[in-house]
Amino acid sequence: MSRRAGTPTAKKVTQLVNEEEHVEGFRQVREAHRRELIDDYVELISDLIREVGEARQVDMAARLGVSQPTVAKMLKRLATMGLIEMIPWRGVFLTAEGEKLAQESRERHQIVENFLLVLGVSPEIARRDAEGMEHHVSEETLDAFRLFTQKHGAK
C-alpha cells in the first residue's frame, strides 16, 4: 500500500525520562563541562613540555586562542587543585596528579578519535570531533568504542 502525499510517516517518539534520570543526566553534563577545561589545560601543558621542552603562558594562550590573563587565571586554579606547579622564570610543570590526568585525557581522546576513524570519518574531522566528545562519554561508552575499534580494525 502506498503512502499518500502529506501523510506523516511513523516516527519513534522519545519518551520523557523520569525526573531523577533527567536530573542525573544534566548533572553529568555539567560535570563534564567543568572538567573539560581542566583536562584541556593539563593535556596541553604535558604536550608542550614533551614537544618543546617547556610550557609557557604565552604559548598556551596562543594555542587555546585566549588571552594571557585568562590562562593565568586558569593556572592559578590548577595550582590550587594540586595539578601544576608554577616556578618563576622557569614555567609551568605538572604534578604527578596532573600528569596522570593529562595521560587519561590523552587516552580518552585517542579512543574516541580511533572509533571515529573506523566509522569512516576523515582524520581532520575525527581529531576535532574527538576533542569535544572525549569529555562527555562514560567509561562504559569508551569501552564500547575501544571494543568496536579492536573488532573492526583501527585505521
From Swiss-Prot:
Principal subcellular localisation of the protein: cytoplasm
Alphabetic keyword roster: Activator, Cytoplasm, DNA-binding, Manganese, Repressor, Transcription, Transcription regulation
A Pfam cross-reference name: Fe_dep_repress
Ranges for domain HTH dtxR-type: 34-95
Cell location: Cytoplasm
GO cellular component assignments: cytoplasm
PROSITE patterns: HTH_DTXR (PS50944)
MF terms in GO: DNA binding; DNA-binding transcription factor activity; protein dimerization activity; transition metal ion binding
UniProt cross-references to PANTHER family, sorted A to Z: IRON (METAL) DEPENDENT REPRESSOR, DTXR FAMILY, TRANSCRIPTIONAL REGULATOR MNTR
Oligomeric form and interacting partners: Homodimer.
Entry's free-text remark on domains: It contains an N-terminal DNA-binding domain and a metal-binding domain.
Function: In the presence of manganese, represses expression of mntH and mntS. Up-regulates expression of mntP.
Family: Belongs to the DtxR/MntR family.
Name of protein: Transcriptional regulator MntR
Naturally occurring in which organism (per UniProt): Escherichia coli O157:H7
Higher taxonomy: Bacteria, Pseudomonadati, Pseudomonadota, Gammaproteobacteria, Enterobacterales
